UniProtKB/Swiss-Prot annotation:
It comes from the Eukaryota. Disulfide bonds join C224-C317, C345-C351. Residues 259-279 have a biased composition (Acidic residues). GO terms for cellular component: apical part of cell; bicellular tight junction; cytoplasmic vesicle; extracellular region; host cell membrane; host cell plasma membrane; host extracellular space; membrane. Pfam families: Rh5. One of its GO terms (molecular function) is host cell surface receptor binding. This is Reticulocyte-binding protein homolog 5. The keyword Cell division does not apply. Glycans are attached at N38, N214, N297.
Amino acid sequence: MIRIKKKLILTIIYIHLFILNRLSFENAIKKTKNQENNLTLLPIKSTEEEKDDIKNGKDIKKEIDNDKENIKTNNAKDHSTYIKSYLNTNVNDGLKYLFIPSHNSFIKKYSVFNQINDGMLLNEKNDVKNNEDYKNVDYKNVNFLQYHFKELSNYNIANSIDILQEKEGHLDFVIIPHYTFLDYYKHLSYNSIYHKSSTYGKCIAVDAFIKKINETYDKVKSKCNDIKNDLIATIKKLEHPYDINNKNDDSYRYDISEEIDDKSEETDDETEEVEDSIQDTDSNHTPSNKKKNDLMNRTFKKMMDEYNTKKKKLIKCIKNHENDFNKICMDMKNYGTNLFEQLSCYNNNFCNTNGIRYHYDEYIHKLILSVKSKNLNKDLSDMTNILQQSELLLTNLNKKMGSYIYIDTIKFIHKEMKHIFNRIEYHTKIINDKTKIIQDKIKLNIWRTFQKDELLKRILDMSNEYSLFITSDHLRQMLYNTFYSKEKHLNNIFHHLIYVLQMKFNDVPIKMEYFQTYKKNKPLTQ
């Protein structure tokens, strides 16, 4: 009887233990399945020393909150209207981090290890092969028609060109929408091939294709070289009333002035007339000086008309070859899009961001550091000061000398410099904005895995940010050089005129040899 009671008690205890164990097991399975159903992204840590550890829930939650806050800040500050963006990517998508599960089997199932090379991809691939849940998954790329690839915007050629003159006798032009468009697909190409570790051969191929694109583009640009060189010659006339750097001042004369005055003024007397007008700047209303001033004013006006005509002619030439330029842009687009469409992941739910990281390290990081090492705002301040001081000096000289061809020349150069400054200011704002945005987005994009669809959006987004940043950085540097090339020549003219006034007010007879001595003993600003 006692033995039967003991047996009955043990049976009851066993049944209770079985029920409790079953409930615990079902609860664990339910928890795991809930995590599986909601999982979109798992973070991968960025330090080699911590690769055997996994961050706990609090750390990840804190990181999520910081990431979301950074995204809000970026969205609020990105006001650039430089080139219309065709990417409708919402950077908040795909950033739903979950706590890492506590079950080792769950972690092993998805091979979430802190590796950033092909070893990680191999682990993912092997796990997927051994996983019944993923045997029927289609690993082909998603439908690329859903992505809004960048197109050439509707633009007016005349309003979309920066004309650059980085040094005297040289002139170049940049069609800004083309530059940004080509750069966008260049970075899309590199981001795509860098997604895999073994990219050396592909990288060489991309470099070669981009070099070919650039050469073809320059070849089309060269079709306007004759018009461009003609414009350079006219600019030289405008900026050099006569060549003050030439020891033989008689060697530079206005042939155009003979046409204006119906050859009434002999060429051999022109230098003497300029000297006389310098001596008599306070007597501009005398009959002889009035005639000379009228001649100079008409000469300058005709040169300005010539300048505007030739500039329009250059723009027309560029527009005439617009189809050739557009074809080159489409070739670059097709090439970059093709590489992008070949991008694949071993596991579509866990695509790593090696490509974004490697491309950033290789091409962008050095540029970011270079920009941050410069004080772009100080550059703007210095240029503003130059423009203000030169305008003040111009006003004073104008009062002293009245109508004088050098004054018109200074006004022309000064107007050009103000336009160049406005362009530099414009590009500087874009550079500052994009530097901050790129750095913030890189923090969110690297050392992580994404679902494939989200990774592709991010590659498009980063390529867009890079192209805007690099276009403005390149153009700002060329415009900067152009500004100081003009400023150097402006200084030369100012020095000459100040010297003239000093001689005049000291009652020293003005002869050309004095100016030669001045140039020899006091080198003009370099």
